[in-house]
Amino acid sequence: MKKFILLIIALFYTVVAYAQGTDQVSAILQHGDTETIFIGNTGFAQAYEAAVDGDVIILSQGIFNTINNISKVLTIYGAGFEDNAETNTATTTINGTVRLGDGSDTEFDGIHIEGVKINGYMGLNSQLKNVTIQRCCITNNVELNHNTENVTFRQCYMLGDILGQYKHANGLLISNCYVSKNINNFSVNSFVHIDHSYMGNMYSRVYREYAQFLWTNSIINKLSGDLPLGYAAIVKNCIFFADNYYNDVDLENCYRLNSVADIFADGENADYSPTRTFELKDPETYVGTDGTPIGLSGGAGWNKVPSNPYVSKVNATLSGTQLNVTYEAGVNK
């Protein structure tokens, strides 16, 4: 109910902007039972400055300026990381690098970011714990610049590398993510789990061999160099398109196909597009450890709509001094 109240507030400002012929963006700060709205591209920064640990920030569609770092335990929702014809929603963009933490050894436990396009790098810069980045697009590298524990990326579109920066990652989970490039550079005894994901280009890099990698239910496109999956990696129910798995890798129920186009129902290669669902051509043949199809369509599925309520259709008309508004709203699970 609280989220729907915030939705109505956001809707109010949307239609006011519509009536005024402007294209405003807004950020709503929820602190307990109090909601405060901030208008304009600096709205996110203003909401952040006013927030305390445990608060929620809801960003409208549109472009927001980034901030120096996020060093408060907040939940941040956007409208989605790309325009969506099905829900009739547009993109929420944070323009610039997003840094979680302030570079100190301070522990930040429970940050959640969902439904946002981050137009730049993402840096994990403090001792982060139980952090979830969900249904987001990150246009450049993700860099783990500090030791972390139980960090999850779920249903994200990641255009750059995931770089461990020689730090210790205790329980890094990449789940139902499309990763265009590589994941590497983790310190001794790190544990990294890639599940129901697409990995674009795995190539060997120093220090990966010292981390424990668990690969499950994933599609791995390109492999090159020495130990591209990690030394003594465990690999279960994955699909490859090359046979250079290399030594000291434990393969279980894996498949090798000749071409990426052989696996997807649409017969296309692995290139990303907003309309693709990455359904498998033979989902009953290529089954994961959990009984669902290997790849993005299995597990939690390839779902890009954030879990906060969204306005799918707005119709605002002026009749004299009266503003008449009709709208449709929905919520994702």
Model regions and ranges:
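Acidic glycine-/aspartate-rich tracts in secreted/extracellular proteins
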Residues: G62-I63, A79-N84, F240-Y246, V260, ...
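Right-handed parallel beta-helix/beta-spiral solenoid domain characteristic of secreted/periplasmic
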Residues: L74-M122, D161
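Detector for repetitive beta-architecture
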Residues: G54-V56, Q61, I67, V73-T75, ...
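C-terminal accessory segments
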Residues: Y255-V305
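Acidic Gly/Asp/Thr-rich repetitive segments characteristic of extracellular carbohydrate-active
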Residues: A27-F64
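Short, compositionally biased P/S/T/A/G/V-rich stretches that sit at domain boundaries
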Residues: T292-L323, G330
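Predominantly extracellular beta-rich ligand-binding scaffolds that present long acidic/polar faces
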Residues: Y121-N125, L144-N145, N150-Y272
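Bacterial Sec-dependent N-terminal signal peptides
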Residues: M1-D23
